[in-house]
Amino acid sequence: MGESMTWVQALVLGLVQGLTEFLPISSSAHLRIVSSVFFGEDAGASFTAVTQLGTEAAVLVYFAKDIWRILVAWTTTLWDKARAATGPRVPIHDRPTTRLPVLTADNEHRFAAEAQRELDYRIGWYVIIATIPIGVLGFLFKDEIRTGARNLWLVSFMLIAFALVIAAAEHYGAKRRPIEQLTTRDGLVMGFAQCLALIPGVSRSGATSSAGLFLGLEREAAVRFSFLLAIPAVTASGLFSLPDAFEPAGEGLNASGPQLLVATIVSFVVGYASVAWLLKFVARHSLNWFVGYRIVLGLVIMGLLGAGVISAT
């Protein structure tokens, strides 16, 4: 059996989760590194998954209006399409003659609202479609994700390797397409990119945002869709990991129920501030600011591993 987690450790790890979840530096890698370097034990994949519920709750609150609008547009448009498909057919010669509407302020507002509704409907589908790959792979490789994928040699390597991917995306990405031009192909590519985040050190936001940049999306559009895309996957992962987190077994730090709750609340509060800051940051700055940090951190961890200061497992 592992050691019991202290309240200080729970607070620190909740803070780390909130600070790093939305930055392209991998929150799972930071929880793995901080718990091992400073506390001598791995907090575990289940602890990571459950505290991510706090940061995803922050996304739900921050994007509440967007999410509600997408849900309403998706359900109502789907219902309208279903009714139109099953309704009575009107012969062409019996259909009323349509006239081009007179362009007025009211019409412009209505057209804009319809365009927004169509976009929200499409984004709803894109999130659903893009979530399928990580759902399948996460289920098939759940044991490997909780064990071998948390090896610090692999984590440090992925921190460095994906730093280069992010830098390449910033350099070669056209960054011309707004979120209104998002397509099914974009959603699928970003969905498969999200699967890479199953490996600590990659970063969910880093993987999906980089994919969006390679596809030519504007940086802010790529990051915004990245946040929306993470909601179903991270929420499902956290709920799936709840039983293991509350009944820990084996090596590592074991958190109690109250400690998990406090860590999750801390991650929510800090995560909300983090997502608000990042969206403002990417509107004016590139993701290259995080590249150097990832490389330095990866090299430091490799150095500590090579010197025998910390254990890889």
UniProtKB/Swiss-Prot annotation:
Keywords: Antibiotic resistance, Cell membrane, Cell shape, Cell wall biogenesis/degradation, Hydrolase, Membrane, Peptidoglycan synthesis, Transmembrane, Transmembrane helix. It comes from the Bacteria. It is a multi-pass membrane protein. Pfam families: BacA. It is found in: Cell membrane. One of its GO terms (cellular component) is plasma membrane. It is an enzyme of class 3 (hydrolase). The keyword Cell wall biogenesis/degradation applies. The chain crosses the membrane at residues 121-141, 152-172, 187-207, 225-245, 259-279, 290-310. One of its GO terms (biological process) is regulation of cell shape. It catalyses: di-trans,octa-cis-undecaprenyl diphosphate + H2O = di-trans,octa-cis-undecaprenyl phosphate + phosphate + H(+). One of its GO terms (molecular function) is undecaprenyl-diphosphatase activity. InterPro entries: UppP. Its EC number is 3.6.1.27. Catalyzes the dephosphorylation of undecaprenyl diphosphate (UPP). Confers resistance to bacitracin. Belongs to the UppP family. Bacitracin is thought to be involved in the inhibition of peptidoglycan synthesis by sequestering undecaprenyl diphosphate, thereby reducing the pool of lipid carrier available. This is Undecaprenyl-diphosphatase. It comes from Nocardia farcinica (strain IFM 10152). The gene is uppP.
